């Protein structure tokens, strides 16, 4: 199973915006998220995070939707359904707690290894990352499709539950379309 997350901006993402009645337009259930951009600079966004578990065909098997300040690894075990043979994820999910959980449930860990301060990656860890990072492109592609075709890059409603419901409906639509595509090309 492939696990990943994506930060979704809240539509009215500035806490100082006020509507014509003088009330804040900021969603009180959304939170700030800080992550490194592609240029290496830290970027802050206000909104939610979407977490998905996808299989090797790109079908979404489980989702979670949280405020932006929830760390990605907090949703790890809730995304797993128990019948996985291996789990692929980025280094945000690397922890002793998760390694222990995976070992106890006899699931092979293919979580990308992370370097720490004064502890660079070994050659073996670099080879492991190179070998398994290519498989993760499937889940990244799912997020790309959700953003491009289903407009999930921004939260459209006020409130966590409304946005979660919308995201889950988009995931259902994605699975229907993806399932039809798999069926079409497997019969040919």
Regions found by a protein language model. Give the residues of each.
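Polybasic low-complexity intrinsically disordered regions
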Residues: 1-91, 96-104
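Short, acidic/turn-prone active-site loops that include or flank metal/cofactor-
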Residues: 67-68, 113-117
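Short, charged, surface-exposed secondary-structure boundary motifs
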Residues: 74, 97, 118-125
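Acidic/polar loop patches that form or flank catalytic/metal-binding clefts of enzymes
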Residues: 87-88, 110-111, 181
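Short secondary-structure boundary segments
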Residues: 91, 113-114, 141
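Feature captures the catalytic cores and cofactor-binding loops of soluble hydro-lyases/lyases
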Residues: 102-103, 115, 120
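Short hydrophobic/aromatic-enriched beta-strand-loop microsegments
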Residues: 105-113
């Amino acid at each position: 199973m492939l696990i990943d997350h994506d930060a979704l901006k809240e539509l009215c993402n500035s806490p100082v915006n006020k509507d014509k009645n003088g009330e804040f337009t900021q969603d009180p259930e959304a939170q700030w998220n800080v992550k490194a951009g592609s240029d290496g600079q830290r970027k802050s966004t206000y909104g939610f995070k979407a977490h998905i578990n996808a299989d090797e065909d790109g079908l979404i098997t489980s989702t979670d939707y949280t405020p932006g300040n929830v760390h990605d690894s907090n949703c790890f075990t809730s995304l797993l359904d128990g019948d996985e043979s291996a789990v692929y994820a980025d280094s945000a999910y690397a922890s002793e707690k998760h390694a222990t959980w995976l070992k106890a449930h006899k699931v092979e860990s293919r979580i990308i290894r992370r370097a720490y301060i004064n502890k660079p990656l070994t050659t073996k860890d670099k080879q492991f990352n190179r070998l398994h990072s290519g498989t993760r492109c499937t889940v990244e592609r799912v997020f790309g499709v959700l953003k491009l075709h289903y407009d999930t890059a921004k939260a459209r409603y006020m409130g966590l539950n409304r946005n979660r419901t919308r995201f889950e409906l988009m995931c259902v639509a994605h699975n229907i379309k993806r399932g039809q595509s798999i069926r079409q090309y497997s019969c040919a």
